[in-house]
């Protein structure tokens, strides 16, 4: 386990750096087509005739909270100090935020369809964090999804999480 922690920390650091660096994450860039291993849903996101999709207050509030939860968890995740129980609790919090977001968000149908792709990746990342062999990958997927959300949805003052 001691050998694994530095490897996981390095992997997370590299992934987070690429997810937060401008232009470093081609798989979630609005101009990118296809699938590059970060999750098919993110690769399928499209812009609204070259513009970001609209958001509403419920969406912005929910995504801001998801970002805050991830930001608060990054130090321990990056340090390899998150336990299985903590990852499960983090996954629960992601799912709870998604539940509230879905319940209260009211977007036009086309924007809602795009949001469902983002939600699918958030839930997939949360599920990955529950598995013994996918926790760090789940956290990385969530970080990349937050980055993609900002690329495709009009959310004033949206900033991706920096590591």
Where are these regions (language model features)?
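Helix-rich interaction surfaces within compact, conserved domain-sized segments
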Residues: 104, 115-163
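Short, solvent-exposed, charged loop/turn and helix-capping segments
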Residues: 97-116
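Sec/Tat signal peptide C-region and signal peptidase I cleavage site
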Residues: 22-26
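Immediate post-signal-peptide N-terminus of mature secreted/exported proteins
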Residues: 27-82, 161
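Short N-proximal segments of mature Sec-exported proteins
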Residues: 70, 85-103
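Amphipathic alpha-helix face/heptad-repeat signature
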Residues: 55-62, 66, 83, 87-90, ...
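Bacterial N-terminal signal peptides that target proteins for export
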Residues: 2-11
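Bacterial N-terminal signal peptides
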Residues: 10-19
